[in-house]
Amino acid sequence: FSYLHDRFNESFNIATDASKNLSFFVKDDDAIQCINERKRVLLKKFDQFGYDYHDYSDYINLMRNTLINIEDIDYINFENAFRWQQELQAVLETETNDLAKQKDRLKESLVDCDQYNRYEKEKEIEKIDDLLSLTSNVGLTDFEMSLLSNKVLIIKGEAGTGKSQLFANETAKFISSDRKVLLLLAGFYADSRSLENQIMEQCRLNFDFEKLIDIFESIGEVERRFVPIFIDALNETWNNGLWKQALPRIIKKINDCNYVKLAISFRSEYERQILDNKLINPKNNPNISYIVHNGFENNTEEAVQAFFNHYGIKFPLEYFLEYKFDNPLFLTLYCKNYQGDEPNLPQLYDRILAKADQNLQCSLPDVFKNNGYTEYDRIVYNLIICICSWIVKNGNKYIDKESLIELSFWKEYRLPLQPIIRELEREKILYSYPYLD
Protein backbone atom coordinates (compact mmCIF):
# COMPACT_ATOMS: atom_id res chain seq x y z
CA PHE A 1 0.00 0.00 0.00
CA SER A 2 2.81 2.43 0.85
CA TYR A 3 4.21 2.00 -2.65
CA LEU A 4 1.02 3.53 -4.09
CA HIS A 5 1.72 6.88 -2.38
CA ASP A 6 -1.05 9.40 -3.19
CA ARG A 7 -2.96 6.87 -5.22
CA PHE A 8 -4.33 5.17 -2.11
CA ASN A 9 -5.70 6.57 1.13
CA GLU A 10 -6.68 3.72 3.43
CA SER A 11 -8.49 5.96 5.92
CA PHE A 12 -10.50 7.99 3.41
CA ASN A 13 -12.47 6.53 0.53
CA ILE A 14 -15.37 7.88 -1.55
CA ALA A 15 -17.70 5.32 -3.12
CA THR A 16 -18.03 5.39 -6.91
CA ASP A 17 -19.98 3.44 -9.51
CA ALA A 18 -16.82 1.42 -10.14
CA SER A 19 -16.42 0.51 -6.45
CA LYS A 20 -20.03 -0.68 -6.32
CA ASN A 21 -19.49 -2.85 -9.39
CA LEU A 22 -16.27 -4.30 -7.96
CA SER A 23 -18.13 -5.15 -4.74
CA PHE A 24 -20.63 -7.19 -6.73
CA PHE A 25 -17.85 -8.88 -8.71
CA VAL A 26 -16.09 -10.14 -5.57
CA LYS A 27 -19.33 -10.49 -3.55
CA ASP A 28 -18.20 -8.47 -0.53
CA ASP A 29 -20.17 -7.15 2.46
CA ASP A 30 -20.97 -3.86 0.69
CA ALA A 31 -22.70 -5.72 -2.14
CA ILE A 32 -24.74 -7.73 0.36
CA GLN A 33 -25.72 -4.56 2.22
CA CYS A 34 -26.64 -2.83 -1.05
CA ILE A 35 -29.06 -5.62 -2.02
CA ASN A 36 -30.73 -5.78 1.38
CA GLU A 37 -30.99 -1.98 1.50
CA ARG A 38 -32.92 -1.94 -1.78
CA LYS A 39 -35.65 -3.97 -0.11
CA ARG A 40 -35.76 -1.63 2.89
CA VAL A 41 -35.89 1.46 0.65
CA LEU A 42 -38.86 0.01 -1.20
CA LEU A 43 -40.68 -0.76 2.05
CA LYS A 44 -40.16 2.86 3.14
CA LYS A 45 -41.50 4.06 -0.19
CA PHE A 46 -44.79 2.25 0.46
CA ASP A 47 -45.23 4.33 3.61
CA GLN A 48 -44.79 7.54 1.59
CA PHE A 49 -47.52 6.85 -0.96
CA GLY A 50 -50.26 8.34 1.20
CA TYR A 51 -53.93 8.84 0.40
CA ASP A 52 -53.34 9.49 -3.33
CA TYR A 53 -52.69 5.78 -3.73
CA HIS A 54 -55.64 4.67 -1.60
CA ASP A 55 -57.34 2.99 -4.58
CA TYR A 56 -54.29 0.78 -5.04
CA SER A 57 -53.85 -0.22 -1.39
CA ASP A 58 -54.54 -3.92 -2.07
CA TYR A 59 -51.70 -4.05 -4.60
CA ILE A 60 -49.35 -2.12 -2.30
CA ASN A 61 -50.17 -4.23 0.77
CA LEU A 62 -49.69 -7.46 -1.16
CA MET A 63 -46.28 -6.30 -2.36
CA ARG A 64 -45.33 -5.06 1.10
CA ASN A 65 -46.28 -8.34 2.80
CA THR A 66 -44.43 -10.36 0.17
CA LEU A 67 -41.29 -8.25 0.62
CA ILE A 68 -41.42 -8.53 4.40
CA ASN A 69 -41.46 -12.32 4.09
CA ILE A 70 -38.39 -12.37 1.84
CA GLU A 71 -35.33 -13.00 4.02
CA ASP A 72 -32.26 -10.79 3.81
CA ILE A 73 -29.35 -12.34 1.99
CA ASP A 74 -25.88 -13.09 3.34
CA TYR A 75 -22.76 -14.49 1.65
CA ILE A 76 -24.02 -18.07 1.67
CA ASN A 77 -27.50 -17.42 0.25
CA PHE A 78 -26.57 -14.39 -1.89
CA GLU A 79 -27.89 -16.07 -5.03
CA ASN A 80 -31.42 -15.92 -3.56
CA ALA A 81 -31.46 -12.27 -4.64
CA PHE A 82 -31.52 -13.52 -8.24
CA ARG A 83 -35.08 -14.68 -7.57
CA TRP A 84 -36.51 -11.74 -5.61
CA GLN A 85 -37.89 -9.98 -8.65
CA GLN A 86 -39.37 -13.19 -10.06
CA GLU A 87 -40.97 -14.03 -6.70
CA LEU A 88 -42.62 -10.63 -6.49
CA GLN A 89 -43.83 -10.77 -10.06
CA ALA A 90 -45.28 -14.25 -9.56
CA VAL A 91 -47.24 -13.22 -6.45
CA LEU A 92 -48.47 -10.03 -8.11
CA GLU A 93 -49.19 -11.52 -11.54
CA THR A 94 -52.99 -11.23 -11.40
CA GLU A 95 -52.97 -7.76 -9.83
CA THR A 96 -50.28 -6.58 -12.26
CA ASN A 97 -52.34 -7.72 -15.25
CA ASP A 98 -55.37 -5.91 -13.83
CA LEU A 99 -53.36 -2.70 -13.45
CA ALA A 100 -52.02 -3.00 -17.00
CA LYS A 101 -55.58 -3.39 -18.34
CA GLN A 102 -56.75 -0.41 -16.27
CA LYS A 103 -53.92 1.66 -17.72
CA ASP A 104 -54.92 0.66 -21.27
CA ARG A 105 -58.53 1.67 -20.63
CA LEU A 106 -57.43 5.03 -19.26
CA LYS A 107 -55.23 5.68 -22.29
CA GLU A 108 -58.09 4.83 -24.65
CA SER A 109 -60.44 7.18 -22.80
CA LEU A 110 -58.05 10.13 -23.22
CA VAL A 111 -59.26 10.61 -26.78
CA ASP A 112 -62.62 12.16 -25.84
CA CYS A 113 -61.58 13.93 -22.60
CA ASP A 114 -61.82 17.58 -21.72
CA GLN A 115 -58.70 19.21 -20.31
CA TYR A 116 -59.57 18.63 -16.63
CA ASN A 117 -60.46 14.95 -17.05
CA ARG A 118 -57.39 14.40 -19.23
CA TYR A 119 -55.19 15.77 -16.45
CA GLU A 120 -56.83 13.50 -13.85
CA LYS A 121 -56.53 10.41 -16.02
CA GLU A 122 -52.91 11.14 -16.90
CA LYS A 123 -52.20 11.36 -13.16
CA GLU A 124 -53.76 7.91 -12.69
CA ILE A 125 -51.69 6.50 -15.55
CA GLU A 126 -48.57 7.95 -13.92
CA LYS A 127 -49.47 6.29 -10.60
CA ILE A 128 -49.97 2.93 -12.30
CA ASP A 129 -46.60 3.27 -14.07
CA ASP A 130 -44.98 3.99 -10.70
CA LEU A 131 -46.55 0.89 -9.17
CA LEU A 132 -45.67 -1.37 -12.10
CA SER A 133 -42.03 -0.26 -11.98
CA LEU A 134 -41.58 -1.08 -8.29
CA THR A 135 -40.60 -4.72 -8.78
CA SER A 136 -37.58 -3.65 -10.84
CA ASN A 137 -36.16 -1.88 -7.75
CA VAL A 138 -35.39 -5.08 -5.83
CA GLY A 139 -32.91 -7.88 -6.34
CA LEU A 140 -30.20 -7.67 -8.97
CA THR A 141 -29.86 -5.97 -12.33
CA ASP A 142 -28.74 -8.01 -15.33
CA PHE A 143 -25.30 -6.36 -15.20
CA GLU A 144 -24.91 -7.13 -11.49
CA MET A 145 -25.83 -10.74 -12.17
CA SER A 146 -23.16 -10.92 -14.88
CA LEU A 147 -20.59 -9.42 -12.48
CA LEU A 148 -21.39 -12.12 -9.95
CA SER A 149 -21.24 -14.98 -12.41
CA ASN A 150 -18.23 -13.88 -14.49
CA LYS A 151 -14.72 -14.71 -13.31
CA VAL A 152 -12.83 -11.91 -15.08
CA LEU A 153 -13.31 -8.14 -14.81
CA ILE A 154 -11.49 -5.64 -17.04
CA ILE A 155 -11.40 -2.03 -15.79
CA LYS A 156 -10.09 0.87 -17.83
CA GLY A 157 -10.10 4.62 -17.23
CA GLU A 158 -8.17 7.84 -17.64
CA ALA A 159 -5.15 8.62 -15.50
CA GLY A 160 -6.01 9.54 -11.92
CA THR A 161 -9.61 8.31 -11.93
CA GLY A 162 -8.95 6.09 -8.92
CA LYS A 163 -8.24 2.62 -10.32
CA SER A 164 -5.42 2.00 -7.83
CA GLN A 165 -7.56 3.33 -4.94
CA LEU A 166 -10.32 1.00 -6.11
CA PHE A 167 -8.21 -2.17 -5.94
CA ALA A 168 -6.24 -1.18 -2.84
CA ASN A 169 -9.36 -0.22 -0.90
CA GLU A 170 -11.06 -3.50 -1.83
CA THR A 171 -7.92 -5.38 -0.78
CA ALA A 172 -7.91 -3.56 2.57
CA LYS A 173 -11.58 -4.50 3.10
CA PHE A 174 -10.79 -8.16 2.42
CA ILE A 175 -7.85 -8.14 4.82
CA SER A 176 -9.91 -6.51 7.59
CA SER A 177 -12.60 -9.18 7.06
CA ASP A 178 -9.96 -11.95 7.25
CA ARG A 179 -10.61 -12.94 3.63
CA LYS A 180 -7.90 -14.02 1.19
CA VAL A 181 -6.90 -11.65 -1.62
CA LEU A 182 -3.86 -10.91 -3.80
CA LEU A 183 -3.03 -7.40 -5.05
CA LEU A 184 -0.30 -7.17 -7.70
CA LEU A 185 1.21 -3.89 -8.93
CA ALA A 186 2.14 -4.27 -12.59
CA GLY A 187 4.70 -1.46 -12.39
CA PHE A 188 7.12 -3.87 -10.69
CA TYR A 189 7.57 -5.95 -13.86
CA ALA A 190 10.55 -4.41 -15.60
CA ASP A 191 12.08 -6.93 -18.02
CA SER A 192 11.07 -9.04 -21.01
CA ARG A 193 10.62 -12.43 -19.34
CA SER A 194 7.16 -13.97 -19.13
CA LEU A 195 4.96 -11.95 -16.81
CA GLU A 196 3.93 -15.04 -14.88
CA ASN A 197 7.59 -15.59 -13.96
CA GLN A 198 8.03 -11.93 -12.99
CA ILE A 199 4.91 -12.09 -10.81
CA MET A 200 6.23 -15.10 -8.91
CA GLU A 201 9.66 -13.51 -8.51
CA GLN A 202 8.09 -10.38 -7.00
CA CYS A 203 6.02 -12.61 -4.69
CA ARG A 204 9.27 -14.38 -3.71
CA LEU A 205 7.78 -17.79 -4.48
CA ASN A 206 9.69 -20.57 -6.22
CA PHE A 207 6.83 -22.28 -8.04
CA ASP A 208 4.80 -21.27 -11.07
CA PHE A 209 1.83 -18.88 -11.27
CA GLU A 210 -0.66 -21.61 -12.21
CA LYS A 211 0.25 -23.44 -9.01
CA LEU A 212 -0.47 -20.26 -7.02
CA ILE A 213 -3.91 -20.06 -8.63
CA ASP A 214 -4.49 -23.74 -7.75
CA ILE A 215 -3.63 -22.95 -4.11
CA PHE A 216 -6.13 -20.06 -4.09
CA GLU A 217 -8.75 -22.35 -5.63
CA SER A 218 -8.20 -24.89 -2.83
CA ILE A 219 -8.49 -22.14 -0.19
CA GLY A 220 -11.67 -20.85 -1.79
CA GLU A 221 -13.14 -24.34 -1.94
CA VAL A 222 -12.48 -24.90 1.76
CA GLU A 223 -13.78 -21.46 2.81
CA ARG A 224 -16.58 -21.45 0.18
CA ARG A 225 -15.62 -17.88 -0.74
CA PHE A 226 -14.10 -16.17 -3.77
CA VAL A 227 -10.37 -15.40 -3.69
CA PRO A 228 -9.79 -12.40 -5.99
CA ILE A 229 -6.55 -11.52 -7.75
CA PHE A 230 -6.22 -7.81 -8.58
CA ILE A 231 -3.55 -6.71 -11.07
CA ASP A 232 -3.32 -2.92 -11.05
CA ALA A 233 -2.00 -0.58 -13.74
CA LEU A 234 -0.97 -3.00 -16.49
CA ASN A 235 0.17 -0.01 -18.55
CA GLU A 236 2.95 0.64 -16.01
CA THR A 237 4.75 -2.60 -16.87
CA TRP A 238 7.94 -1.49 -18.62
CA ASN A 239 7.23 -3.76 -21.61
CA ASN A 240 3.44 -3.67 -21.32
CA GLY A 241 2.96 -5.41 -24.67
CA LEU A 242 3.82 -8.65 -22.84
CA TRP A 243 0.29 -8.65 -21.42
CA LYS A 244 -1.08 -9.45 -24.89
CA GLN A 245 0.45 -12.91 -24.58
CA ALA A 246 0.09 -13.35 -20.82
CA LEU A 247 -3.56 -12.38 -20.29
CA PRO A 248 -5.12 -15.08 -22.51
CA ARG A 249 -3.09 -17.71 -20.62
CA ILE A 250 -4.03 -16.31 -17.21
CA ILE A 251 -7.71 -15.85 -18.12
CA LYS A 252 -7.92 -19.43 -19.44
CA LYS A 253 -6.60 -20.70 -16.11
CA ILE A 254 -8.97 -18.48 -14.10
CA ASN A 255 -11.97 -19.67 -16.13
CA ASP A 256 -11.14 -23.25 -15.09
CA CYS A 257 -11.59 -22.23 -11.44
CA ASN A 258 -14.74 -21.99 -9.34
CA TYR A 259 -13.45 -19.79 -6.52
CA VAL A 260 -10.71 -17.60 -8.03
CA LYS A 261 -11.57 -14.34 -9.79
CA LEU A 262 -9.32 -11.94 -11.70
CA ALA A 263 -9.72 -8.16 -12.04
CA ILE A 264 -7.24 -6.06 -14.01
CA SER A 265 -6.93 -2.31 -14.61
CA PHE A 266 -5.13 -0.08 -17.07
CA ARG A 267 -5.31 3.39 -18.62
CA SER A 268 -7.80 3.50 -21.49
CA GLU A 269 -5.33 4.71 -24.12
CA TYR A 270 -3.21 1.58 -23.62
CA GLU A 271 -6.03 -0.83 -24.41
CA ARG A 272 -4.71 -1.91 -27.82
CA GLN A 273 -1.18 -2.35 -26.47
CA ILE A 274 -2.33 -4.55 -23.59
CA LEU A 275 -5.32 -6.54 -24.87
CA ASP A 276 -5.29 -8.75 -27.93
CA ASN A 277 -8.06 -8.19 -30.45
CA LYS A 278 -10.20 -11.00 -29.05
CA LEU A 279 -10.33 -9.35 -25.62
CA ILE A 280 -11.03 -5.77 -26.70
CA ASN A 281 -14.66 -6.19 -27.77
CA PRO A 282 -17.07 -6.96 -24.88
CA LYS A 283 -19.60 -8.43 -27.33
CA ASN A 284 -17.14 -11.21 -28.16
CA ASN A 285 -16.59 -12.04 -24.48
CA PRO A 286 -19.89 -12.50 -22.60
CA ASN A 287 -18.00 -14.31 -19.82
CA ILE A 288 -15.85 -11.24 -19.10
CA SER A 289 -17.21 -8.09 -17.45
CA TYR A 290 -16.00 -4.67 -18.62
CA ILE A 291 -16.33 -1.33 -16.82
CA VAL A 292 -14.94 2.18 -17.33
CA HIS A 293 -13.84 3.98 -14.17
CA ASN A 294 -14.93 7.62 -14.54
CA GLY A 295 -13.78 8.79 -11.12
CA PHE A 296 -16.26 11.13 -9.43
CA GLU A 297 -18.11 11.97 -12.64
CA ASN A 298 -21.49 11.07 -11.14
CA ASN A 299 -20.87 12.45 -7.63
CA THR A 300 -18.38 15.32 -8.11
CA GLU A 301 -19.99 17.81 -5.73
CA GLU A 302 -20.40 15.23 -2.97
CA ALA A 303 -16.78 14.10 -3.42
CA VAL A 304 -15.32 17.63 -3.42
CA GLN A 305 -17.26 18.53 -0.29
CA ALA A 306 -16.06 15.34 1.44
CA PHE A 307 -12.44 16.01 0.43
CA PHE A 308 -12.56 19.64 1.58
CA ASN A 309 -14.06 18.59 4.91
CA HIS A 310 -11.42 15.86 5.31
CA TYR A 311 -8.55 18.26 4.61
CA GLY A 312 -10.09 21.21 6.46
CA ILE A 313 -10.47 23.47 3.41
CA LYS A 314 -13.04 26.19 4.12
CA PHE A 315 -13.48 27.92 0.75
CA PRO A 316 -16.96 27.86 -0.81
CA LEU A 317 -17.53 24.74 -2.87
CA GLU A 318 -18.70 26.68 -5.94
CA TYR A 319 -15.33 28.45 -6.18
CA PHE A 320 -13.53 25.22 -6.93
CA LEU A 321 -15.86 23.55 -9.45
CA GLU A 322 -13.93 25.16 -12.34
CA TYR A 323 -11.12 22.64 -11.78
CA LYS A 324 -11.18 18.99 -12.86
CA PHE A 325 -12.22 17.71 -9.47
CA ASP A 326 -14.05 14.71 -10.90
CA ASN A 327 -10.53 13.27 -11.16
CA PRO A 328 -9.71 11.81 -7.71
CA LEU A 329 -5.93 12.08 -8.10
CA PHE A 330 -6.03 15.77 -9.03
CA LEU A 331 -8.43 16.44 -6.16
CA THR A 332 -6.13 14.58 -3.75
CA LEU A 333 -3.02 16.43 -4.92
CA TYR A 334 -4.83 19.75 -4.74
CA CYS A 335 -6.02 19.18 -1.17
CA LYS A 336 -2.68 17.83 0.05
CA ASN A 337 -0.77 20.78 -1.37
CA TYR A 338 -3.29 23.47 -0.49
CA GLN A 339 -1.91 25.73 2.27
CA GLY A 340 -4.79 28.08 2.99
CA ASP A 341 -3.72 30.69 0.49
CA GLU A 342 -5.48 31.88 -2.66
CA PRO A 343 -5.67 29.01 -5.18
CA ASN A 344 -2.82 29.33 -7.66
CA LEU A 345 -2.14 26.43 -10.02
CA PRO A 346 1.54 27.25 -10.80
CA GLN A 347 2.19 27.43 -7.06
CA LEU A 348 0.33 24.16 -6.60
CA TYR A 349 2.46 22.44 -9.25
CA ASP A 350 5.66 23.68 -7.61
CA ARG A 351 4.52 22.15 -4.32
CA ILE A 352 3.67 18.90 -6.09
CA LEU A 353 7.19 18.73 -7.55
CA ALA A 354 8.71 19.36 -4.12
CA LYS A 355 6.54 16.60 -2.64
CA ALA A 356 7.51 14.28 -5.49
CA ASP A 357 11.19 14.89 -4.67
CA GLN A 358 10.57 13.78 -1.09
CA ASN A 359 8.62 10.68 -2.14
CA LEU A 360 11.15 9.76 -4.82
CA GLN A 361 14.02 9.81 -2.37
CA CYS A 362 12.01 7.80 0.16
CA SER A 363 11.25 5.16 -2.49
CA LEU A 364 14.83 4.99 -3.83
CA PRO A 365 17.00 6.00 -0.86
CA ASP A 366 20.12 4.09 -1.93
CA VAL A 367 20.10 5.57 -5.43
CA PHE A 368 20.21 9.13 -4.08
CA LYS A 369 22.39 8.60 -1.00
CA ASN A 370 25.05 6.81 -3.05
CA ASN A 371 25.25 9.87 -5.30
CA GLY A 372 25.17 12.38 -2.44
CA TYR A 373 21.75 13.88 -3.21
CA THR A 374 19.08 15.13 -0.80
CA GLU A 375 15.54 16.43 -1.38
CA TYR A 376 16.95 19.96 -1.42
CA ASP A 377 18.77 19.24 -4.70
CA ARG A 378 15.39 19.40 -6.49
CA ILE A 379 16.12 16.45 -8.76
CA VAL A 380 12.53 16.21 -10.00
CA TYR A 381 12.34 19.92 -10.75
CA ASN A 382 15.61 19.81 -12.70
CA LEU A 383 14.48 16.78 -14.70
CA ILE A 384 11.19 18.47 -15.59
CA ILE A 385 13.05 21.63 -16.68
CA CYS A 386 15.30 19.46 -18.86
CA ILE A 387 12.28 17.77 -20.45
CA CYS A 388 10.52 21.11 -20.99
CA SER A 389 13.64 22.53 -22.67
CA TRP A 390 13.72 19.56 -25.04
CA ILE A 391 9.99 19.99 -25.84
CA VAL A 392 10.40 23.72 -26.55
CA LYS A 393 13.49 23.11 -28.68
CA ASN A 394 11.82 20.39 -30.76
CA GLY A 395 8.40 22.01 -31.03
CA ASN A 396 6.56 18.96 -29.70
CA LYS A 397 3.94 18.59 -27.00
CA TYR A 398 5.53 15.36 -25.77
CA ILE A 399 8.88 13.59 -25.52
CA ASP A 400 9.25 10.06 -26.86
CA LYS A 401 10.88 7.33 -24.80
CA GLU A 402 14.06 7.23 -26.93
CA SER A 403 14.63 10.97 -26.55
CA LEU A 404 13.94 10.75 -22.82
CA ILE A 405 16.63 8.09 -22.50
CA GLU A 406 19.12 10.27 -24.41
CA LEU A 407 18.67 13.40 -22.26
CA SER A 408 21.94 14.77 -20.86
CA PHE A 409 20.30 14.84 -17.41
CA TRP A 410 21.08 11.16 -16.77
CA LYS A 411 24.82 11.51 -17.33
CA GLU A 412 25.02 14.86 -15.57
CA TYR A 413 23.32 13.61 -12.40
CA ARG A 414 24.60 10.00 -12.64
CA LEU A 415 21.16 8.58 -11.89
CA PRO A 416 19.50 5.41 -13.28
CA LEU A 417 16.67 6.15 -15.69
CA GLN A 418 14.26 3.23 -15.34
CA PRO A 419 13.48 3.28 -11.58
CA ILE A 420 13.21 7.08 -11.52
CA ILE A 421 10.86 7.22 -14.52
CA ARG A 422 8.75 4.46 -13.00
CA GLU A 423 8.46 6.37 -9.71
CA LEU A 424 7.64 9.67 -11.43
CA GLU A 425 4.86 7.95 -13.37
CA ARG A 426 3.49 6.69 -10.06
CA GLU A 427 3.68 10.22 -8.71
CA LYS A 428 1.86 11.39 -11.87
CA ILE A 429 4.65 13.86 -12.60
CA LEU A 430 5.25 12.09 -15.89
CA TYR A 431 2.33 10.85 -17.92
CA SER A 432 3.05 8.17 -20.52
CA TYR A 433 0.77 7.08 -23.32
CA PRO A 434 1.09 5.14 -26.59
CA TYR A 435 1.72 7.31 -29.62
CA LEU A 436 -0.86 6.61 -32.33
CA ASP A 437 -0.69 8.08 -35.84
Q: Where would I find each of the regions flagged by the language model?
A:
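N-terminal pre-Walker A segment at the start of P-loop NTPase domains
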Residues: 2-58, 64-67, 83-145
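Conserved Walker B catalytic segment
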Residues: 234-263, 278, 415, 419
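Conserved P-loop NTPase "ATPase switch" module shared by AAA+ and STAND
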Residues: 218-244
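The conserved phosphate-sensing helix
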Residues: 321-336
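C-terminal leucine-rich, beta-strand-based interaction scaffolds used for sensing/assembly
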Residues: 1-37, 43-65, 73-76, 157, ...
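Conserved small helical "lid"/interfacial subdomain of P-loop NTPases
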Residues: 270, 278-317, 353-361
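P-loop NTPase Walker A phosphate-binding motif
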Residues: 153-179, 268-272, 276-280
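Post-nucleotide-binding-loop coupling segment downstream of the phosphate-binding loop, primarily
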Residues: 161-227
